Swiss-Prot record:
Its main location: cytoplasm. Disulfide bonds: none annotated. It comes from Finegoldia magna (strain ATCC 29328 / DSM 20472 / WAL 2508) (Peptostreptococcus magnus). InterPro entries: aa-tRNA-synth_II/BPL/LPL, Ala-tRNA-lgiase_IIc, Ala-tRNA-ligase_IIc_anticod-bd, Ala-tRNA-synth_IIc_core, Ala-tRNA-synth_IIc_N, Ala-tRNA_ligase, Ala_tRNA_ligase_euk/bac, DHHA1_dom. The lineage of its organism: Bacteria, Bacillati, Bacillota, Tissierellia, Tissierellales. PANTHER family: ALANINE--TRNA LIGASE, CYTOPLASMIC (PTHR11777:SF9), ALANYL-TRNA SYNTHETASE (PTHR11777). The gene is alaS. Keywords: Aminoacyl-tRNA synthetase, ATP-binding, Cytoplasm, Ligase, Metal-binding, Nucleotide-binding, Protein biosynthesis, RNA-binding, tRNA-binding, Zinc. This is Alanine--tRNA ligase. Residues 424-443 are annotated as: Disordered.
Length: 873
C-alpha cells in the first residue's frame, strides 16, 4: 500500500473520475447558497440537492468533487477523543440519472485497489439485506469473496428521510486488524473500531411517499461520499485523523509555539487537538465569508476561535498565536487550495481581531468564574452567573458550560435563556402600534388576487378599489385610516430594503393620503391611507398618484447603495457583503459584513469612488433574465435570498451588477452627489454606513454653513481660516488651567492621606481605609488610592468617587494582604452590588461602577465587612 498524502489523494480522486466523463466541480463555499435548511455545508452532496431533484442542471449528468464540510454537533467531544473533528473534506462522485450501481461499485473498487493500491484482503463490504443487485455486482463482477460481503438492515444500509428520494447503500470498510478486535468472526456492523467505513455508495432509486410506500423513480441517482481524512489515515497507516501527515504538521507548529510536546500529557493533548482542528475550520470559514458574530454561522466561528484561544491559554501561551497556526494551515493546504494564500491577510486579520477581543476579557472572566464557582456548593451553576459572564465578559454559554463541566457542575440553562430573552425584550423597546381602529394582527390581502404593478414605468394611473380594510366594512370616510387594495397600482410596495411609496388616491368624491405601501407574499399591494375628504367604497374607480419628488429621492438613494456596495468591496475588501439595507427618501442605510471599523481614510476613498461614478453619468440598465444567465454575467445577490427562475438585474456599466427589484435612476448622474454621514457597529461582525444623496446633501451643506458661522461668531474669528488658530489658542489655555487645578487638587488630596489612614479600621492586623470623594477625574482618583496604599504595609484601600448620577469604586490591596486571601476583585464586587453596580479586576487592584450614589456609606461599610469575612474576623 503506497503512502499517499491527503493532497495527493484528493488530486488522484478528481483526476480519476474526471477521466471517466465526470464534471470536476470546485468545492462549494461552506455557506449554503439558496438553502435555508442548512447553517453550514455538512456533506458532499448538500450543495447538489437541486441537481438531484432536477431543479438545476450541470453541463454533464455526472460530476465529482472534494467538498469542504463543517459539522459542529460533536464540538464538545473534539480533542477529548481522537475520532471527532469539525472540519473535513468529502470526496464524492455523483450521477444525476446517468450511470447506476454497476459503474459506482466497480469504479470505487478500482480506485481503491489500483489507483491507491489498498490491499484487497483488508477491504470488506456491507450491502442492504434486500439489495441483491448490489450484492451480485460485488461478488460476481468485482470478485470479492462472499464471506467479506455483509448484509445489514435499514438502520445501517438504507438512506432515507421521512419522505422523498431514498435508497439502499453499500459501504466499503477497512479491516484495521486483530489489535482492535481479536475475534475471528468479527465483521462490519459489529461494535468497536476494528472496521473503519471509508466509502459510502448511496443508490437513490426510490421515492418514499407520505404514507410510507416506496415507489421506483424513473432515473435513479448515485451519491457517494468518502472522507478524505479517513482514507488518508488508511494509506498513511495512522491511528486517527490527528496522526495524518497534514495535521501533524499543524500540531508541530502548536508544539513550537507552546513549548509543549504532543503525546506526553493527556490534558495537553486535548488542547493541542482542539487547536489543530478548530484552526483548520476557522481558516476555511473565514475564507468562505463567515464573520464572527453572536448569531448562526458567525457564532459557530466565534466559538471555534474562542475555544482555540482558551486552550492556547491552557498550554501556557499568553500571547496571540492563532495567526501562526493559520499560516501553518494555509501552507499544508496550499497545493489543493492556492486561493488561501492569496486571501491570507484577510483571514488572519479577522481571526486576530476576534482573538484580541477575547483575550482582553479572558483572564478577567476566568477569575470571575473561579470566584463564582468558589461561592457555591451547588452542583448547578446559576443562569444568572452564566448570563453575567456572557453579557459582561463575552463568554459564550457553550464555553461556560464547558468550563463548569470540567468541575462536574451543570449550568441552569433555563434561567440563562430567560435572562437572554428579557434582554432582547428590553432591546426591542416598547413597540406600541398606532391605533388604526382595527386588528393589527390580521394578515391582509391573503385571499385576494395578485395586484398588477406598473410602478417601474409610470407614477400615475387609473385603478379600481377591490378591497378596503378599516373601521367600517367596504368603505372609508373622512378622518378614518385604513388599507386600500387596488386591481393595479403604480405605488412600490416595501421590499428589498426600500420603503413603500407615498402619494395620493382620489376621485371626484374622495381624497386620501397614502403614507405607506406594503406588499404581501402573494404580491397583493396594501395602500395605507388617511382619508382627508369624502368617502370611498369597494368597486369605486380612482386615480392613483405617487409622490414624484419622494420617489426620485428614493431612487437616488437605492442606486447609490449599489455603487456604495461595490466601492466598499474595492476599498475594504472583497469579503464585504451586504448584511441589510434601508432606503427611503431622506437617506440610505447600508449594513456590511466586516470585522472592524471602516477607517476614515477608507470612507473618504469609498465616497470619492462613488462620486466619480456619479459624475461619469453611467447608464443604469435593467433587464429580466433567468437566474443562471444572471449568474453567468456576474450578477450579485444575497446568499440567503430565494430568487425566482426569472430575476431582475440592475447593471451600472461594468462596475455594478446586482439582482434587485427596487426602483432606480436612469443614469448615475441623476444621483447628483453622495455624502457618507456615519459609520458604526450594529452587531458583532456587522458595520453600518449611513449616507445621503441629492437634495439631502444640499440641506446638509447648508446646515454645515450655518454651524461654521455660529462657530466663527463664538470664537470671534473673522473667517474660516482663523477658526483653527482660535481653537488651538483656547485649547492651550484650557490645558494650562486644568494643570493648575490638578496641582491644587493633588495638594489638597495629599493632605488627606494621613487622616484617611488614621481613621482606618484594623482587622486582625490589616488596616482597612475607606473614603468618599466627589467629582474627581479618574487619574486623580486612582493616584489618591495608590498614595494611601504606598503608606500601608498590610492594608486595604476602598474609595468611592460620586456625583449626582453615578458612583465609581476602587479597591487596592497590599501584597501582604493578598497573601492572606484578601482580593480587590472580591471586595469591589460586593461594594458595587450595594449601589446596583458590578465590576472586577486583579487581586491587588479592581474597579467598579454603579448608578445609585445614595448608598455610598452603606457600600463602604460592606467593603469592611467583606475584608473581615476573608480574615475570619
Amino acid at each position: 500500500m503506497k503512502n499517499y498524502g491527503l493532497n495527493e489523494i484528493r488530486k488522484k480522486f478528481l483526476d480519476y473520475f474526471g477521466e471517466r466523463g465526470h464534471l470536476v466541480i470546485k468545492s462549494f463555499p461552506l455557506i449554503p447558497q439558496d438553502d435555508k435548511s442548512l447553517l453550514l455545508i455538512n456533506a458532499g452532496m448538500a450543495p447538489l440537492k437541486k441537481y438531484f431533484t432536477g431543479e438545476k442542471k450541470l453541463k454533464k449528468d455526472r460530476a465529482t468533487s472534494s467538498q469542504r464540510c463543517i459539522r459542529t454537533a460533536d464540538i464538545d467531544e473534539v480533542g477529548k477523543t481522537q475520532r471527532h473533528g469539525t472540519f473535513f473534506e468529502m470526496l464524492g462522485n455523483f450521477s444525476f440519472g446517468d450511470y447506476f450501481k454497476r459503474e459506482a461499485i466497480t469504479w470505487a473498487w478500482d480506485f481503491l485497489t489500483n489507483e491507491l493500491e489498498v490491499p484487497k484482503d483488508i477491504l470488506w463490504v456491507s450491502v442492504y439485506e434486500e439489495d441483491e443487485e448490489a450484492y451480485n455486482i460485488w461478488v460476481n463482477e468485482v470478485g470479492i469473496s462472499p464471506e467479506r460481503v455483509v448484509k445489514l438492515g435499514k438502520a445501517d444500509n438504507f438512506w432515507e428521510l421521512d419522505q422523498g428520494p431514498c435508497g439502499p447503500c453499500s459501504e466499503i470498510h477497512v479491516d484495521r486488524g486483530f489489535e482492535f478486535d481479536p475475534r475471528e468472526d468479527a465483521k462490519p456492523g459489529d461494535e468497536g473500531e476494528r472496521f473503519l467505513e471509508v466509502w459510502n455508495l448511496v443508490f437513490t432509486q426510490f421515492n418514499k411517499t407520505a404514507d410510507g410506500k416506496y415507489e421506483r423513480i424513473a432515473h435513479p441517482n448515485i451519491d457517494t461520499g468518502m472522507g478524505l481524512e479517513r482514507i488518508t489515515m488508511v494509506l498513511e497507516n495512522a491511528d486517527n485523523i490527528f496522526e495524518i501527515g497534514l495535521v501533524k504538521d499543524i500540531i508541530k507548529t502548536i508544539e513550537e509555539i507552546s513549548g509543549v510536546k504532543y503525546k506526553e500529557n493527556h490534558k495537553n493533548d486535548v488542547s493541542i487537538r482542539i487547536i489543530a482542528d478548530h484552526v483548520r475550520a476557522m481558516t476555511f470559514l473565514i475564507y468562505d465569508g463567515v464573520i464572527p458574530s453572536n448569531e448562526q454561522r458567525g457564532y459557530v466561528l466565534r466559538r471555534l476561535i474562542r475555544r482555540a484561544c482558551r486552550h492556547g491559554k491552557l498550554l501556557g501561551i499568553n500571547d496571540s498565536f492563532i495567526e501562526k497556526v493559520i499560516d501553518s494551515c494555509i501552507k499544508v493546504y496550499e497545493s489543493g487550495y492556492p486561493e488561501l494564500k492569496e486571501d491570507r491577510d484577510r483571514i488572519v486579520k479577522i481571526a486576530n481581531a476576534e482573538e484580541k477581543k477575547f483575550q482582553e476579557t479572558l483572564d478577567l472572566g476566568l477569575n470571575i468564574l473561579d470566584s463564582m464557582l468558589k461561592e457555591t456548593d451547588s452542583d448547578v451553576f446559576s443562569g444568572e452567573n452564566a448570563f453575567k459572564l456572557y453579557d459582561t465578559y463575552g463568554f459564550p454559554i457553550d464555553l461556560t458550560k464547558e468550563l463548569v463541566g470540567e468541575v462536574n457542575k451543570t449550568v441552569d440553562e433555563v434561567q440563562f435563556k430567560k435572562l437572554m430573552e428579557e434582554q432582547k425584550e428590553r432591546a426591542r423597546g416598547s413597540r406600541n402600534e398606532s391605533n388604526m381602529g382595527w386588528s393589527s394582527d390580521k394578515k391582509y390581502g391573503e385571499e385576494l388576487p395578485e395586484t398588477k404593478f406598473d410602478g417601474y414605468n409610470s407614477l400615475k394611473d387609473e385603478s379600481k378599489v377591490i378591497e378596503i380594510y378599516g373601521e367600517d366594512e367596504n368603505n372609508l370616510k373622512a378622518g378614518q385610516m385604513g388599507i386600500i387594495v387596488l386591481d393595479c397600482t403604480t405605488f412600490y410596495g416595501e421590499g428589498g430594503g426600500q420603503v413603500g411609496d407615498k402619494g395620493i388616491i382620489y376621485n371626484d368624491n374622495f381624497k386620501a393620503e397614502v403614507y405607506d405601501t406594503k406588499k404581501t407574499g402573494k404580491k397583493v399591494f396594501l395602500h395605507y391611507v388617511k382619508v382627508t375628504e369624502g368617502s370611498l367604497h369597494v368597486g369605486d374607480k380612482v386615480t392613483i398618484e405617487v409622490d414624484e419628488l419622494n420617489r426620485r429621492d428614493i431612487m437616488k438613494n437605492h442606486s447609490a447603495t449599489h455603487l456604495l456596495h461595490q466601492a466598499l468591496k474595492d476599498v475594504v475588501g472583497d469579503h464585504v457583503n451586504q448584511a441589510g439595507s434601508y432606503v427611503d427618501g431622506e437617506r440610505l442605510r447600508f449594513d456590511i459584513t466586516h470585522f472592524e471599523a471602516v477607517s476614515k481614510e477608507q470612507l473618504e476613498k469609498v465616497e470619492q469612488i462613488v462620486n466619480d461614478k456619479i459624475a461619469l453619468g453611467i447608464p443604469v440598465k435593467i433587464d429580466e433574465m433567468s437566474l443562471e444567465e444572471s449568474q453567468s454575467i456576474g450578477a450579485r445577490g444575497l446568499f440567503e435570498d430565494k430568487y425566482q427562475d426569472v430575476v431582475r438585474v440592475v447593471q451600472m456599466g461594468d462596475y455594478s451588477i446586482e439582482l434587485c427589484g427596487g426602483t432606480h435612476v436612469k443614469t448615475t448622474s441623476d444621483i447628483q452627489m453622495l455624502k457618507i454621514i456615519s459609520e458604526s457597529s450594529v452587531a458583532a461582525g456587522v458595520r453600518r454606513i449611513e449616507a445621503i444623496t441629492g437634495r439631502a446633501v444640499y440641506k446638509y451643506l447648508k446646515e454645515r454653513d450655518r454651524l461654521i458661522d455660529n462657530v466663527k461668531h463664538s470664537l470671534k474669528a473673522s473667517n474660516e481660516d482663523e477658526i483653527t488658530r482660535r481653537i488651538e489658542m483656547n485649547t492651550e489655555e484650557i490645558k494650562g488651567l486644568k494643570k493648575k487645578l490638578k496641582d491644587i487638587t493633588n495638594k489638597d488630596l495629599s493632605s488627606n492621606v494621613d487622616s484617611v489612614i488614621n481613621d482606618a479600621v484594623e482587622v486582625n492586623g490589616t488596616k482597612v481605609c475607606t473614603f468618599e470623594l466627589s467629582g474627581l477625574d479618574n487619574n486623580s482618583f486612582r493616584d489618591f488610592g495608590e498614595n494611601i496604599k504606598s503608606k500601608l504595609e498590610d492594608g486595604v484601600v476602598i474609595l468611592a468617587n460620586s456625583d449626582e448620577s453615578k458612583v465609581s469604586f476602587i479597591a487596592l490591596v497590599t501584597d501582604s494582604s493578598v497573601k492572606k486571601g484578601v482580593f480587590a476583585g472580591d471586595i469591589v464586587r460586593e461594594v458595587a452590588k450595594v449601589c446596583g453596580g458590578n465590576g472586577g479586576g486583579r487581586k491587588d487592584f479592581a474597579q467598579a461602577g454603579a448608578k445609585d450614589s445614595s448608598k455610598v456609606d452603606e457600600a463602604l461599610q460592606k467593603g469592611i465587612e467583606t475584608v473581615k469575612s476573608k480574615l475570619n474576623a
